[in-house]
């Protein structure tokens, strides 16, 4: 058995983008046991993944995590975060390891000065660079997203007008530059001839109410427990941030 630790602390979109590599690790390495270290608030994204055997949650004490991880005696560590915390963990474990080309400076040039020298390589394929030494290759089966049975939200519980299909629109985002203004969202919604469910968190309630008032709508949800199921069942899923 080969025991492998994958480090990815955040965030939702980036975590989902790690799933092809994790699946291929599990399926292409015989008797592989896959562990993940991630932030506590994102742990459920990995806990529902059948290709992962164990999830370690980082909250406040990286020292505690390191002490626990040392006991696992990993055969290999895959750093998909590549920041100060993940490097600290990798060095402390002292096991064979690899990372991926993060290209931070190139991303800075693109986002700040609009100078695009980014390679034409998808981030998923860049993640696979970290496991080349293990002879793991992309199977091109796409991303994985697994929903816990306890979060299943039957469409029958929605109003009748939603049961023949609906669109879902995520109105929040990690950064202000990734959040569409309510007026712009309302403009989009007015062009849609299907019922729409607005999705977000507690910080998005006020924004949702403004959007509803602009389009004369009646319903919204900010319940994170059912967001994933609503996204999955929607005919069209729109967002401005990565999800």
Give the residues covered by each predicted segment.
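Catalytic machinery of carbohydrate-active enzymes
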Residues: 1-243
């Amino acid at each position: 058995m080969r025991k492998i630790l994958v480090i990815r602390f955040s965030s939702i979109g980036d975590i989902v983008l790690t799933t092809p590599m994790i699946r291929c690790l599990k399926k292409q390495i015989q008797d592989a046991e896959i562990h993940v270290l991630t932030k506590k608030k994102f742990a459920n994204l990995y806990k529902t993944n059948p290709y992962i055997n164990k999830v370690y949650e980082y909250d406040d004490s990286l020292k505690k995590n390191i002490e626990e991880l040392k006991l696992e005696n990993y055969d290999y560590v895959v750093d998909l975060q590549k920041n100060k915390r993940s490097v600290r963990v990798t060095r402390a474990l002292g096991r064979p390891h690899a990372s991926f080309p993060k290209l931070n400076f190139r991303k800075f040039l693109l986002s700040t000065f609009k100078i695009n020298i980014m390679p034409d390589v998808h981030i998923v394929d860049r993640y696979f660079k970290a496991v080349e030494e293990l002879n793991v290759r992309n199977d091109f089966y796409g991303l994985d997203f697994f929903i816990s049975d306890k979060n299943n939200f039957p469409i029958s519980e929605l109003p009748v007008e939603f049961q023949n299909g609906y669109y879902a629109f995520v109105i929040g985002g990690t950064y202000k530059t990734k959040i569409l203004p309510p007026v712009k969202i309302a403009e989009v919604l007015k062009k849609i001839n299907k019922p729409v469910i607005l999705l977000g968190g507690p910080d998005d309630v006020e924004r949702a109410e403004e959007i509803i008032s602009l389009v004369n709508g009646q319903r919204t949800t900010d319940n994170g427990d059912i967001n994933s199921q609503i996204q999955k069942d929607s005919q069209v899923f729109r967002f401005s941030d990565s999800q």
